[in-house]
Design a protein with these regions (language model features):
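Short, solvent-exposed loop/turn segments at secondary-structure junctions
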Residues: 30-33, 65-66, 81, 135-138, ...
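Beta-strand elements within well-structured catalytic alpha/beta cores of enzymes
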Residues: 20-36, 50-51, 75, 121, ...
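Residue-level detector of anion-binding/catalytic polar loops
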Residues: 57, 127, 243
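His/Asp/Glu-rich, glycine-adjacent segments
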Residues: 3-4, 76-217, 223, 294, ...
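Low-complexity, glycine/alanine/valine/leucine- and proline-rich hydrophobic stretches
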Residues: 351-413
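Active-site-proximal N-terminal segment of extracellular/periplasmic enzymes that hydrolyze or transfer
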Residues: 1-56
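Secreted, luminal/periplasmic, and some membrane-associated catalytic domains
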Residues: 28, 66-67, 91, 95-108, ...
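Short, structured active-site-proximal loop/turn typified by the sulfatase FGly-forming signature C/S-X-P-X-R
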Residues: 36-83
Length: 418
């Protein structure tokens, strides 16, 4: 920051220092800690290896459900979903369809109940840029932001009026990437580096896609290739003098039979239709988004709306006996435990075990896009995420365990200056 009397700003009850040195926070989609360790051990990610060994590297928790939207918004708001309101990629909106309700994507800023710290920093005078892989996040992350905000998915159509920057393919020097590719995330990193090289920025947020993580386990050739690419761009940002904080929105695990490769799925709507009658209950899968080739809308977290007068306790008890189920809670208990907005969560929250996913009806899931055995997320087993920095942390940590939405507080308030 230059020529500014302000040195701090606030957002959602948390105080932050305006960056005295350029600062970037990176959310690596689906990045469980083991991906970083494996790439470092293989010798393909020397910069990451240095951070893991000699800077500040922690294991923390993401928010539950361990999906993209609720965690990215928690990170950029600095608070859990009960405050900002985004509790899934997809939910049952009781106010939609003229009050009759409808299942909708949770991509519209109208669903946000809190402002982002990015917008607050920009309002306080910081030059801010946000780059996301998937366009579904762009409007949420960029809500009320005066600055640069674009997605790699639609980089070729970015305009000054809408995105604060144009001619991105020329600037970055890469072709428009496919949404189903590792190159989509590389474009995010490459664009971040080019902005750092060509603009006077104070704060950046980079958010990737988990295309590689859905297909490849830690230590695989494909995963290590991805992290080697990421390592080069992070090292360049470090060379340019940027403070770096890296976290993830969630981890990732195999969700298939190790012998057959078939997904391990509990089709909840089929189960409840047998128990209660056809379509009496409604199963919502908050992992649902337009990118079905990643996961086939199969994750380890679901919510259930029961018919009026339904016996919640009895259904919870019955669901708890199903093979592959880890946890079943009623709405008040789940929302208190996971800090979720009660009015956007069903009567029941259900979470499956590490290698099991939850579906709706079998015939409603198009799995033709799954070219490799299913890997997915959403449950408690994908809650652990990294928080790593290229400078040492000064002072006491803000929470124990750390949460991924502590990363801006750590990066702006507690990194040791160089």
């Amino acid at each position: 920051m230059e020529n500014s009397r302000d040195t701090h700003f606030s957002a959602n009850g948390r105080d932050y220092r305006l960056p005295s040195t350029p600062t970037v926070v990176v959310c690596v989609d689906g990045c469980q800690y083991q991906y970083l360790e494996a790439a470092a051990a293989a010798g393909v990610a020397p910069f990451i290896a240095r951070l893991l060994a000699g800077a500040s590297a922690f294991k923390g928790n993401c928010v539950i459900p361990s999906f993209t939207n609720p965690n990215n918004l928690s990170i950029v708001c600095g608070v859990p979903p009960v405050v900002h309101g985004i509790c899934g990629n997809y939910f049952w909106d009781e106010t939609a369809n003229q009050g009759k309700g409808a299942e909708v994507m949770m991509n519209d800023p109208c669903y946000l109940r809190a402002g982002t710290l990015l917008a607050a920093a920009a309002e306080a005078g910081a030059a801010v840029a946000v780059i996301t892989a998937k366009d579904k996040l762009r409007r949420l992350l960029g809500w009320q932001l005066q600055g640069i905000c674009f997605s790699a998915e639609t980089a070729n159509t970015a305009t000054l009026a809408e995105n604060g920057v144009d001619q991105l393919l020329d600037l970055v020097g890469l072709p428009q990437p496919s949404v189903y590719s590792a190159e989509l995330s590389e474009f995010v990193f490459a664009a971040g580096v080019r902005l750092a090289e060509t603009r006077k920025l104070d704060l950046m947020y980079l958010s990737t896609t988990d295309y590689v993580q859905h297909k490849s386990a830690p230590g695989s050739v494909e995963a290590n290739t991805f992290y080697a690419m990421m390592d080069r761009y992070l090292a360049r940002l470090d060379q340019l003098g940027w403070a770096i904080g890296l976290t993830a929105d969630h981890g990732m695990n195999a969700k298939h039979d190790p012998l057959s490769g078939e997904p391990n799925v509990i089709y909840l709507q089929d189960v409840l239709d047998r128990w209660l009658g056809s379509a009496r209950a409604r199963v919502i899968l908050p992992i649902t988004d337009p990118y079905v080739a990643h996961h086939g809308a199969l994750g380890s977290y679901a919510t259930i709306y029961l018919p009026e007068g339904g016996d919640t306790a009895a259904i919870i008890a019955r669901l708890s006996t199903l093979d592959g189920i880890e946890l079943v809670l009623d709405n008040p208990s789940a929302c208190a435990r996971f800090e979720l907005p009660n009015d956007r969560v069903g009567d029941i929250v259900i979470i499956s075990q590490k290698h099991v996913v939850l579906g709706s009806r079998r015939e409603q899931h198009d799995l033709s896009g799954l070219t490799v055995p299913l890997r997915s997320h959403g449950g408690l087993s994908e809650q652990e995420v990294p928080l790593i920095f290229n400078r040492r942390i000064v002072g006491a940590l803000p929470s124990d365990p750390l949460r991924n939405f502590d990363i801006f507080s750590l990066a702006l308030n507690q990194l040791e200056p160089r």
